[in-house]
Curated annotation (Swiss-Prot):
Presence of keyword Coiled coil: no
S-S pairs: none
Keywords carried by this UniProt record: Hydrolase, NAD, One-carbon metabolism
Source organism (scientific name): Populus euphratica (Euphrates poplar)
UniProt-listed GO biological process terms: one-carbon metabolic process
Cofactor, how bound (note): Binds 1 NAD(+) per subunit.
Class in the EC hierarchy, top level: hydrolase
KW Nucleotide-binding (keyword) present: no
Catalytic activity annotation: S-adenosyl-L-homocysteine + H2O = L-homocysteine + adenosine
Enzyme Commission number(s) from the entry: 3.13.2.1
Single GO molecular function: adenosylhomocysteinase activity
Protein's recorded name: Adenosylhomocysteinase 2
Subunit structure comment from the entry: Homotetramer.
Family according to the record: Belongs to the adenosylhomocysteinase family.
Length: 13
């Protein structure tokens, strides 16, 4: 999970 609730800064935007 590159982008998820745990890593919203990984590419959630």
């Amino acid at each position: 999970a590159e982008f998820g609730p745990s890593q919203p800064f990984k590419g959630a935007k």
